[in-house]
A protein has these predicted regions:
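Terminal amphipathic alpha-helical/low-complexity segments used for targeting or macromolecular assembly
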Residues: 1-104, 165, 170, 175-177, ...
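Structural signal for interior beta-strand "rungs" in well-ordered beta-sheet cores
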Residues: 40, 100-192, 201-243
Length: 243
């Protein structure tokens, strides 16, 4: 995947100077950049490396004397970090999950799969779950009973979403996230040593054996539109109402 300097500039809404027809396939810091990279030199600390860089093109702050570094073209950014957001999006090849529903996926007959959905191998969609249109589920994803996921979700490999979870549109879950697990609440018939220690700020405690009973998590999890959950994050379900 490659773009010309002019195509990138137009896509990002940035001015450029120099040769707009140079093809670009990646980005790198100036010291590591190759001839088909944009050297990221928006900060003054990186400008010194441009003179020895293989890069022909750089992204620099507006007003930089770029020709003195031997460059053939530049993208000019008035707010460099924001410009990097768009540039990285344009050049990100993503996880390249296959399109369509893998024959190795386990889809319950009572699950609802809307149009243009991709589901990777060894993923499971349980009874009554619904996957919104345009969504992508990577390999080894679990979606529990009755869970509803809105359109255009991107759920990366190894994500676990338990039963009765409701998720809005354009949801992103990074690798290994776990949503809707048990709230892990326990209680003892009498005040526990932990409770007593907390109430007395540690002045009184108890180490005698106690019987612990689980408080089951009867609620679910509700997540709105345009939410992203980070890798290996965990969101547990509520006790009597949704988290």
């Amino acid at each position: 995947m490659s773009y010309t300097v002019e195509e990138i500039a137009n896509g990002l809404g940035l001015p450029f100077e120099g040769a707009g027809d140079i093809k670009i396939s990646g980005v790198a810091e100036p010291a590591e950049a190759d001839v088909d990279h944009i050297a990221l030199a928006m900060k003054p600390d990186f400008l010194a490396d441009l003179g020895n860089s293989k890069a022909r093109v750089a992204m620099v702050a507006a007003g930089t004397d770029w020709q003195s570094f031997g460059l053939q073209a530049v993208l000019l950014a008035s707010r460099p970090r924001f410009a990097l957001s768009g540039l990285s999006a344009a050049l990100d090849q993503g996880a390249e999950y296959p399109t369509g529903i893998s024959q190795l996926a386990d889809i319950h007959p009572e699950a609802e799969i809307d149009g243009d959905v991709s589901i990777g191998p060894f993923s499971v969609v349980a009874r009554g779950a619904r996957i919104g249109s345009g969504s992508v589920l990577g390999p080894q994803v679990y979606v529990g009973c009755g869970t509803v996921i809105g359109p255009d979700a991107l759920i990366h490999a190894g994500v676990r979403i338990a039963h009765n979870v409701t998720i809005g549109a354009r949801f992103v879950a990074q690798i290994g996230a776990a949503i809707g697990g048990d709230g892990f609440s326990f209680v003892t018939p009498e005040p526990s040593g932990v409770e007593v220690a907390r109430q007395t700020l540690g002045k009184v405690g108890s180490d005698h054996e106690q019987v612990w009973a689980r408080i089951h998590s009867l609620g679910g999890v509700t997540i709105g539109d345009d939410v992203e959950i980070g890798a290996n994050s965990s969101i547990d379900r509520g006790t009597v109402r949704d988290t």
